[in-house]
């Protein structure tokens, strides 16, 4: 053994070739943490010092190669002073460069996935062999940063600027055949042949059949583009990528700038350019928010995994109420391998549900994400029915009938009599109390909420709602089923609106106040979209449905009268009375026309302004900053209350619920991280400036205490 550590070993194979193997003890995947980097330093030094070594193959002892850097270390590292962070980055890069500069040929054998630092390790090798089932990529832009272990330097010199920009700016994972096509790898082989192929390549290089130094040289030199070619390549790319990424996500454009700035330098000077840009991005609030979001997501997955021990296996599911929502649930279940009964009392409802599922599956086939055979298999997994005849074998039933407590209670009581005693029954209600609905059931311990968001196939969140009498098995089984469907479940305790809608309606309350002061809803939408929301509140109201919003507002007002009750008519009332229900009937805040692709396109409608005139109580001048504060303060304060009331257990769950459920701007990290970014004391002072607007703008006593003590929600 040439070197043995806790993450890396180097052992001799044959003919002077050694294997540098990554296998981080106690972890399911390999990652570049402090330990792995320090051991890589020691391993490279050991190889360099051993005159008997003639070649190196780099392998993984895990099912994946290396998933990248240890993101949990970013939080502390990125707090370091700029000079210290840059020095640490350059020190790490020196390890990769020293590996690249070894006198002997090096071959990386890529299995599973090689992402971020994992791919950058491979780029430092002379040759790369890839398993046919493996994927490679540089996803750092999704964390608000860019590759920091030489990715912006080596990749463009290896596969050309255009390809490198596409890989780095998109952050996508690339299949083996695509990597081979652009020259990122030298060979693709069957998984079982990977080790042998890498060894064979190393032997050929040792024998002089392949010139490893010639292969290495372009990575050490400046980019092979003249000044005009550089200008054409980089300026075009920056314009296109900036348009794709938008102004709130600077990393993709910064990556291109870094490649451009380093184009005329050799490797070592180019790495300094990369490090300077990396440090600049690491210090942005966007990077802090997106890294926080990633860590929150990991926390969510860990919490959901804990339920696996108690959960019952769901072999057969059922959905009550077909239509668009029921069809979406049936599609998602069948697509992910759980057959499902889809029941409705109307033939046309069943047809609508089947059409929805077939349409969604068809789109996946069109995009090449599903084979026709798999589509047929999924469709066969949806069994339409108008009776409870086959419900005796069902493990979980999702009720998705009309949002009316009496109707739901009747249907729930009916289905309870048709299923086996230990079957779980879940209601896809968006606002109705689970404890109230449970009153109709004989086995309330087997009942919980399972709130999907529309459209089901696109929205990742599922709220799993615990009622007063809900048992742990019901929660665990529903969480496990949601995960099996490819969703991100969050367990919340029962209250009007649960987490997401409870937080969303105060946001709409701020919107109502702005409209009452005569502020143009088109302007409000533009300001909130600029803030980072996928759509403004007027457009969102139209998409959700004015009638749905009207009903939800009434439920919330009844549940929280101290701050959500309304005096007099609001915009949603007059729109509802004028039968302007939004996209569903072609008119709401906006009017809707059908575009060339058959999709609704919003246009301004003078009639909407006429309808809104009676609700304007006074004309008030407001700035764009006021608009953001009117909207965001109530949303953030209600999120704080949900955490304080124990509706959610953790700040991470609260923030992820908003990002996954209503499209809260990811680069802002969630409502609680947004408060942290402003500063808790500063946020409380800001809210107090708007105190005259009512209780929605009044911070809680506990938040004031946090402000006084200099506390934060994260870190």
Curated annotation (Swiss-Prot):
GO biological process, alphabetically ordered: fatty acid beta-oxidation
Catalyzed reaction equations: a (3S)-3-hydroxyacyl-CoA + NAD(+) = a 3-oxoacyl-CoA + NADH + H(+); a (3S)-3-hydroxyacyl-CoA = a (2E)-enoyl-CoA + H2O; a 4-saturated-(3S)-3-hydroxyacyl-CoA = a (3E)-enoyl-CoA + H2O; (3S)-3-hydroxybutanoyl-CoA = (3R)-3-hydroxybutanoyl-CoA
Pathway: Lipid metabolism; fatty acid beta-oxidation
Origin: domain of life: Bacteria
Annotated spans, Enoyl-CoA hydratase/isomerase: 1-190
Annotated residues for binding of substrate: 297, 501, 660
One cellular component (GO) term of this entry: fatty acid beta-oxidation multienzyme complex
Region entry 3-hydroxyacyl-CoA dehydrogenase, spans: 312-715
InterPro entries: 3-OHacyl-CoA_DH_CS (IPR006180), 3-OHacyl-CoA_DH_NAD-bd (IPR006176), 3HC_DH_C (IPR006108), 6-PGluconate_DH-like_C_sf (IPR008927), ClpP/crotonase-like_dom_sf (IPR029045), Enoyl-CoA_hyd/isom_CS (IPR018376), Enoyl-CoA_hydra/iso (IPR001753), FA_oxidation_alpha_subunit (IPR050136)
EC numbers on record: 4.2.1.17, 5.1.2.3, 5.3.3.8, 1.1.1.35
Swiss-Prot/TrEMBL keywords: Fatty acid metabolism, Isomerase, Lipid degradation, Lipid metabolism, Lyase, Multifunctional enzyme, NAD, Oxidoreductase
Record-listed NAD(+) binding positions: 325, 344, 401-403, 408, 430, 454
Site (Important for catalytic activity): 120, 140
Matching HAMAP family: FadB
Family, per entry: In the N-terminal section; belongs to the enoyl-CoA hydratase/isomerase family. In the C-terminal section; belongs to the 3-hydroxyacyl-CoA dehydrogenase family.
Record NCBIfam families: FadB, PRK11730.1
Oligomer and partners: Heterotetramer of two alpha chains (FadB) and two beta chains (FadA).
Function: Involved in the aerobic and anaerobic degradation of long-chain fatty acids via beta-oxidation cycle. Catalyzes the formation of 3-oxoacyl-CoA from enoyl-CoA via L-3-hydroxyacyl-CoA. It can also use D-3-hydroxyacyl-CoA and cis-3-enoyl-CoA as substrate.
Name by which UniProt lists this protein: Fatty acid oxidation complex subunit alpha
High-level lineage: Bacteria, Pseudomonadati, Pseudomonadota, Gammaproteobacteria, Pseudomonadales
């Amino acid at each position: 053994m040439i070197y043995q550590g806790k993450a890396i070993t180097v052992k001799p194979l044959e003919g002077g070739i050694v294997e540098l193997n990554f296998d981080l003890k106690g972890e399911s995947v390999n990652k570049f943490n402090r330990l792995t980097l320090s051991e890589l330093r020691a391993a490279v030094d050991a190889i360099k010092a051993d005159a008997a070594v003639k070649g190196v193959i780099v392998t993984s002892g895990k099912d994946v190669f290396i998933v990248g850097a240890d993101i949990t270390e970013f939080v502390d590292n990125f707090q370091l002073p700029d000079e210290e962070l840059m020095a640490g980055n350059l020190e790490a890069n020196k390890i990769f460069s020293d590996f690249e500069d070894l006198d002997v040929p090096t071959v990386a054998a890529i299995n599973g996935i090689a992402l971020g630092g994992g791919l950058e390790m491979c780029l430092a090798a002379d040759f790369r062999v890839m398993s046919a089932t493996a994927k490679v990529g540089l996803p750092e832009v999704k964390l608000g940063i860019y590759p920091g272990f030489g990715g912006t330097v080596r990749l463009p010199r290896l596969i050309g600027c255009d390809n490198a920009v596409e890989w780095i700016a998109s952050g996508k994972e690339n299949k083996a055949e695509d990597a081979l096509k652009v020259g990122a790898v030298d060979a693709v082989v069957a998984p079982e042949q990977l080790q042998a192929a890498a060894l064979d390549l190393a032997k050929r290089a040792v024998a002089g059949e392949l010139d490893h130094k010639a292969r290495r040289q372009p990575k050490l030199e400046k980019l092979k583009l003249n000044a005009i070619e550089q200008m054409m390549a980089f300026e075009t790319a920056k314009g296109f990528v900036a348009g794709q990424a938008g102004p709130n996500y600077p990393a993709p454009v910064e990556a291109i700038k870094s490649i451009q700035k380093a184009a005329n330098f050799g490797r070592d000077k180019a790495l300094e350019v990369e490090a300077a840009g990396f440090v600049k991005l690491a210090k942005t609030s966007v990077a802090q928010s997106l890294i926080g979001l990633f860590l929150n997501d990991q926390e969510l997955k860990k919490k959901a995994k804990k339920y696996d021990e108690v959960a019952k296996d769901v072999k057969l599911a059922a959905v009550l109420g077909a239509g668009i929502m029921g069809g979406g649930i049936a599609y998602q279940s069948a697509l992910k391998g759980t057959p499902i009964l889809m029941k409705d009392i109307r033939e046309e409802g069943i047809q609508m549900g089947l059409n929805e599922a077939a349409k969604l599956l068809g789109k996946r086939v069109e995009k090449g994400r599903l084979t026709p055979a798999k589509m047929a298999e999924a469709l066969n997994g949806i069994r339409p029915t108008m009776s409870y005849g086959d419900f005796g074998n069902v493990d979980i039933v999702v009720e998705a009938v009309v949002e009316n407590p009496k109707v739901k209670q009747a249907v729930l009581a009916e289905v309870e009599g048709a299923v086996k005693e230990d079957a779980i029954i879940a209601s896809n209600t968006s606002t109705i109390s689970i404890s109230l609905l449970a009153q109709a059931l004989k086995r309330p311990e087997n009942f919980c909420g399972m709130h999907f968001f529309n459209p089901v196939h696109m929205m990742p969140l599922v709220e799993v709602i615990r009622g007063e009498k809900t048992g742990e098995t019901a929660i665990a089984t529903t969480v496990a089923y949601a995960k099996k469907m490819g969703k991100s479940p969050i367990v919340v305790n029962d209250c009007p609106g649960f987490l997401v809608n409870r937080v969303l309606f105060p946001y709409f309350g701020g919107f109502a106040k702005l409209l009452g002061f005569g502020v143009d809803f088109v302007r409000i939408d533009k300001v909130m979209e600029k803030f980072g929301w996928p759509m403004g509140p007027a457009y969102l109201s139209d998409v959700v449905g004015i009638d749905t919003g009207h009903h939800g507002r009434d439920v919330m007002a009844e549940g929280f009268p101290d701050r959500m009750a309304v005096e007099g008519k609001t915009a949603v009332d007059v729109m509802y009375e004028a039968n302007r229900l939004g996209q569903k009937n072609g008119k709401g805040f906006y009017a809707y026309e059908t575009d060339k692709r058959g999709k609704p396109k919003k246009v301004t409608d003078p009639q909407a302004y006429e309808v809104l005139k009676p609700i304007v109580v006074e004309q008030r001048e407001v700035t764009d900053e006021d608009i953001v504060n009117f909207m965001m303060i109530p949303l953030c304060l209600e999120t704080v209350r949900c955490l304080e009331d124990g509706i959610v257990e953790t700040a991470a769950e609260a923030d992820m619920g908003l990002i996954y459920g209503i499209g809260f701007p990811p680069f802002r990290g969630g409502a609680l991280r947004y408060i942290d970014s402003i500063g808790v004391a500063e946020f409380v002072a800001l809210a107090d400036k708007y105190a005259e607007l009512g209780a929605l703008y009044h911070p809680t006593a506990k938040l004031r205490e946090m402000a006084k003590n200099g506390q934060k929600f994260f870190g």
